Design a protein with these regions (language model features):
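N-terminal amphipathic/basic-hydrophobic helices that include classical n-h-c signal peptides
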Residues: 1-21
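C-terminal regulatory domains involved in ligand/effector binding and gene-expression control
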Residues: 14-112, 117-237
Length: 237
């Protein structure tokens, strides 16, 4: 179960459903890159993060696609699969998967505008957490841009349920998270986390959270062509 309280404003939303906030947009000071193995495909990939213009948002670019159609705007509307990884794609059928840790790092560092270049269909898994991506962003440096950040306006509670899983958004004058997981496995069992992500708490308290899985699922996943790049240095088993 998860509860997220999002920024709430009465100034009125624009056509995109977002409102201006007191904070300015941010991007990177300079390009930065890394390489690593992709969790599910098992291939070696290179990734770069590039500064982007105000209002351009987050954009993925497949550098291994020679013709047009290599750009994928990062948006919930472009999610094509969320089975064991988040995959987004465009109308040309070009996709990039396992983007969730990088997205968490960009959100946690309050980066609004960036171009993400990758030379394959999946981002590198690194150590299985968002922390290496936070380090990458800090290496690049963060610059404030001359335009207000725009945020989704939550006016009433919203809840999504899928079996025993649920996520709720609740109007608030602040921004906070409350998470709860409950597994039969005693090594994980029931855990809770409530946090207000300000003043570096994302980096210190959230970014190091790592992907975990169960040993009994590994053979089944690999038979299905998944977790081919999984290892004990990029996942907890």
């Amino acid at each position: 179960f998860g509860v997220i309280e999002l920024y709430h404003d009465e100034t009125g939303a624009g056509p995109d459903g977002r409102v201006s906030t007191p904070m300015n947009q941010k991007s990177l000071r300079k390009p930065v890159g890394c390489s690593g193995i992709a969790l599910h495909s098992g291939i070696d990939v290179e990734m770069k993060l590039l500064p982007a213009e105000t209002g351009s948002g987050l954009t993925l670019r497949r550098t291994d696609i020679a013709n047009g159609g290599s750009l994928i705007p990062v948006s919930w509307e472009n999610v094509v699969s969320s089975y064991l990884a988040t995959t987004i794609g465009n109308k040309h059928g070009v996709t990039v998967s396992t983007i969730e840790h990088l997205m968490a790092a960009l959100a946690g560092c309050e980066i609004d505008n960036v171009v993400i270049e990758v030379d394959g269909p999946e981002l590198p898994i690194m150590d299985g957490s968002a922390a290496p991506f936070v380090d990458l962003i800090e290496q690049a440096g963060i610059v404030e841009q001359d335009a207000p950040r725009r945020a989704i306006q939550i006016l009433k509670p919203v809840k999504v349920e899928d079996g025993e899983r649920s996520l709720a958004l609740i109007p608030s004058d602040g921004f906070s998270f409350s998470f709860e997981i409950d597994f039969e496995t005693s090594s994980i069992a029931r855990q809770e986390l409530a946090i207000v992500p300000v003043n570096g708490t994302f980096k210190s308290d959230i970014a190091n959270a790592r992907t975990f899985g169960f040993a009994e699922d590994v053979d089944r996943m690999r038979a299905a062509g998944l977790a081919l790049g999984g290892a004990l240095d990029n996942a907890i088993v």
